């Protein structure tokens, strides 16, 4: 029961189509987004944009900025479709906002893969108590 509660808390902190984003992470990197990134650094998971701790944390900052541009869909509730073709993510939505949401998630999955060498296990669970507000614009 405790494990289910912990997973529910982690799911709340991940924005976007949770199922889709998690699948993209596994396909791009072989990592689980929920267990590896949902509380990472100062920008991953719940909360506003803060000064990134490293390049991995910066990925979440950019992702939140991408979501901020969405106007006609809700990154928390809405779901989209995509396919995995020749080891590449292909967003396949007729709805322009859902397609853009898919593109945001695709971009962050690729960006995380490109920054795997900056991932610091010590920052995997950060309570964000010492994170500084950022002046970085989206």
Swiss-Prot record:
Marked site, Hydrophobic membrane-disruption site (MDiS), at 127, 130
Q: Where is this site: Cationic membrane-docking site (MDoS)?
A: 128, 133
What are the cysteine partners in each disulfide bond? 42-131, 44-60, 65-138, 66-104, 73-97, 91-102
Tissue distribution is:
Expressed by the venom gland.
Gene3D superfamilies given in the database record: Phospholipase A2 domain
Please name one Pfam family that this protein belongs to.
Answer: Phospholip_A2_1
Keyword Secreted set for record: yes
Q: Region Important for membrane-damaging activities in eukaryotes and bacteria: which residues?
A: 121-133
Which named protein is this? Basic phospholipase A2 homolog Ts-K49b
User: Which organism encodes this protein?
Assistant: Trimeresurus stejnegeri (Chinese green tree viper)
């Amino acid at each position: 029961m405790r494990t289910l509660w912990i997973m529910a808390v982690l799911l709340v902190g991940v924005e976007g189509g949770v199922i889709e984003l998690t699948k993209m992470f596994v396909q791009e990197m072989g990592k689980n987004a929920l267990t590896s990134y949902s509380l990472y650094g100062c920008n991953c998971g719940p909360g506003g944009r803060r000064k990134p701790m490293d390049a991995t944390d910066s990925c979440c900052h950019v992702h939140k900025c991408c979501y901020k541009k969405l106007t006609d869909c809700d990154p928390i509730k809405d779901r989209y479709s995509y396919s995995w073709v020749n080891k590449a993510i292909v967003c396949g939505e007729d709805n322009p906002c859902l397609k853009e949401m898919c593109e945001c998630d695709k971009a962050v999955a690729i960006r995380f893969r490109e920054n795997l060498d900056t991932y610091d296990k010590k920052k995997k669970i950060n309570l964000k108590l010492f994170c500084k507000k950022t002046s970085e614009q989206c």
